[in-house]
A protein has these predicted regions:
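Non-catalytic terminal extensions of PLP-dependent enzymes
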Residues: 13-30, 39-57, 62-80, 84-178, ...
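Conserved PLP-enzyme active-site core in the AAT-like
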Residues: 23-26, 31, 36-45, 58, ...
């Protein structure tokens, strides 16, 4: 972070001379200076350069108006403003939060001015770092000699072997030196929640509107187990979203609890919907308990929000209506809901606490914010026993956490704090909506076919678009009003061949064919359905990536329309069986797969498979115990009718079990 923007647009030569001399002096001590003669050019550069650490301009010409423009982009960056001796100025108290540093046009004082600039920039760098990350950076800079773990000792051990040296060179010095032992007292403890680790947790909680937050270094699969182990006692009953992630199933295999499943909806495209409002009522839950012969009321509920395909619940309705005291929202796919108004009432931590309710929200920070893989968080709102919770936390947390994952969690929170987070989300949402509109435009301009987008006809309003019973663009049956809404940054593209009512056309282009082509292009699809493709527009997606995806989709249409040979469109697929694909063309491949889908009624079978829940012969925990005891056998899928499954059966992605352990397959 060593870029400084200089606006040198004064008509007075002595001012210009000072600006250029300042630039030379800064360059000589390692800064990169970018000089502009137009204000808007400089503003555009600031918007696109996160490594900027200072802005220099003439106060006589621009005064506070330019400061405010810069502050809207970065409220903390130092503004080094130069004033004439005879220039007066007024600043209101409310404007003193802008980081202003005043200097006079004195060419003889330039070395001293640059020293002061360096000090201000150092302060800026310190200010933007959150507590744990700051402590970690400071420790790494001290170059201490240690005689404890890890054994590579800041990378030294790797450099004693050719293979290790290559490994070291690939990851770099700071990666090695920041991998340190939990023995370092000045960094506190993740397990004891002390020192800078505790400061990081408090910092994160304030950013995410939680009463308490915990950092998880091995993913939300673990976060879910921590929450479940605390919330679900042995012999207890738990309400479980049937669209739960497999980690929730693993929790039920570990803990001796009885699940009562809340059944979500699903549409013809295979898109996972939400649990209907009626399923959250006291009467419905009572009926489910009676049907299973369960006498005790559920102690806990687990709800997936949002769904894998980007559908949010009105969480305020659930928090206020669901008659269970402890509710866990598995929000692995939406760690950004606190940072833009469109997500109001869409998150577990949003809004005020609900009296008598304990709310947990688990989030995969790494999935859609900026953090390393496995970085996850648990947020809590309400009263709970921290000591008991920490036993569950320690049960699932390594005693040798990778501190770079901890720091990335904290940095992610720092990036999203305040107006900066809103601005980041706004850019992400705007880019996603622009992409959606471009797909629609290309479709309207096409004489025959193009990809469609699963969304309402009108997306001019920037919001999470509601699913309702009036406009059935979504294809869900008997949808509740004011209950579910679509996240604008989760984009599902539809290929020809299937309509929203589940009707298969005579000709179709299965999504797997398109996904294969995109893979050749270096584009990886998040999830592929029979005729749908899910794309996630995260913070890391920029205009270049968006345009590349549009170009690739248009190119697929070009190849398809000219009926190119498979080896030209899908060379990787062709290489797997050159004889079979030798003279095959792309339309023949697509139509052939489509005919198989029609013949075997794949969308209909998928819908029915999720619509009818299997019979629970025993709990997942007891089924797993039978496997441990060796009371299981392997069998072919065709032989499973009337047998009890010892394991879960699931497609991945999305990792939502079709069959739970302990359920009987009834054909």
């Amino acid at each position: 972070m060593n870029y400084i923007a200089i606006l040198n647009d004064s008509d007075e030569s002595y001012k210009s001379k000072v600006m250029l001399s300042i630039a030379d002096e800064l360059n000589s001590i390692g800064f990169n200076t970018d000089i502009y003669d137009d204000e808007q050019d400089m503003i555009s550069s600031i918007e696109n350069n996160a490594r900027l650490c200072g802005v220099i301009f003439d106060w006589d010409r621009h005064d506070l108006a330019l400061c405010q423009k810069i502050s809207q982009i970065n409220s903390r960056v130092p503004n080094f403003v130069f004033v004439s001796k005879n220039h007066g100025f007024e600043i209101k108290l409310s404007q003193l939060t802008i980081n202003l540093r005043f200097h006079e046009y004195l060419i003889a004082h330039i070395p001293d001015i640059v020293i002061k600039m360096q000090q201000a920039i150092d302060e800026y760098r310190e200010t933007i770092l959150p507590p744990f990350t700051k402590a970690l950076f400071s420790y790494v800079g001290k170059e201490k000699y240690t005689f404890c773990t890890p054994g590579h000792m800041g990378g030294t051990a790797f450099e004693r072997s050719p293979a290790g040296a290559l490994f070291y060179d690939f990851y770099g010095e700071n990666t090695m030196r920041s991998d340190i032992s939990v023995s370092m007292d000045e960094l506190g403890s993740l397990l004891d929640h002390s020192g800078p680790h505790r400061e990081a947790e408090n910092y994160i909680a304030s950013v995410f509107n939680a009463d308490r937050s915990y950092i998880i270094t091995n993913g939300t699969s673990t976060a879910n187990k921590v929450v479940g182990m605390y919330s679900c006692h042995a012999g207890g009953t738990v309400l479980v979203d049937r669209n739960c992630h497999k980690s929730i199933t693993h929790l039920m295999m570990m803990s001796d609890i009885t699940p009562v499943y809340l059944k979500p909806t699903r549409n013809a495209y295979g898109i996972l919907g939400g649990i209907p409002k009626s399923e959250f009522s006291h009467e419905h839950i009572e009926a489910l308990l009676k049907a299973q012969g369960i006498g005790q009321w559920p102690c806990h509920a687990i709800i997936t929000n949002s769904t894998y395909d980007g559908l949010f619940y009105n969480t305020q309705f659930i928090k206020q209506t669901l008659p269970v005291k402890s509710i866990h929202f598995d929000s692995a796919w939406v760690p950004y809901t606190q940072f833009h108004p469109v997500y109001q009432n869409k998150s577990g931590m949003g809004g005020e606490p609900v009296s008598g309710k304990l709310i947990f929200e688990t989030q995969s920070t790494h999935k859609l914010l900026a953090a390393f893989s496995q970085a996850s968080m648990i947020h809590v709102k309400g009263d709970f026993n921290e000591s008991t919770f920490n036993e569950a936390y320690m049960m699932h947390t390594s005693t040798s956490p990778l501190y770079s994952i901890v720091a990335s969690c904290e940095i992610s929170a720092a990036m999203m704090k305040g107006a900066a987070g809103v601005r980041l989300m706004e850019k992400t949402i705007d880019l996603a909506i622009s992409f959606r509109k471009e797909i629609v435009r290309l479709g309207n301009e096409s004489e025959d076919w193009f990809f469609d987008v699963w969304q309402p006809d009108n997306i001019d309003e920037v919001c999470c678009w509601p699913l309702n019973s009036v406009n059935n663009w979504h294809g869900f049956k008997n949808i509740d009003d004011d209950h579910m809404s679509l996240d604008p940054i989760k984009i599902t593209l539809l290929t020809p061949g299937l309509d929203r009512h589940g009707n298969l056309a005579d000709v179709g282009i299965p999504a797997s064919v398109v996904a294969g082509f995109l893979s050749e292009y270096g584009i990886i699809v998040e999830k592929t359905g029979p005729y749908s493709l899910l794309f996630l527009f995260s913070l890391g997606v920029d205009k270049t990536k968006s345009l590349t995806l549009l170009k690739a989709l248009s190119e697929f249409k070009y190849f398809y329309d000219k009926n190119a040979l498979v080896h030209e469109v899908l060379p990787e697929l062709f290489s797997k069986d050159p004889v079979f694909y030798k003279n095959m063309r792309i339309q023949a491949l697509a139509h052939g797969i489509h005919k198989l889908i029609v013949k075997h009624r794949l969308p209909e079978l998928m819908y029915e498979a999720f619509e009818t829940l299997p019979q629970m012969a025993m709990t997942p925990h007891r089924a797993f115990q039978q496997e441990i005891l060796g009371n299981t056998c392997e069998c072919l899928l065709s032989e499973m009718t009337d047998k009890i499954s010892a394991n879960m059966i699931l497609p991945y992605p999305p990792g939502v079990p079709l069959i739970m352990p302990g359920e009987k397959l009834t054909g």
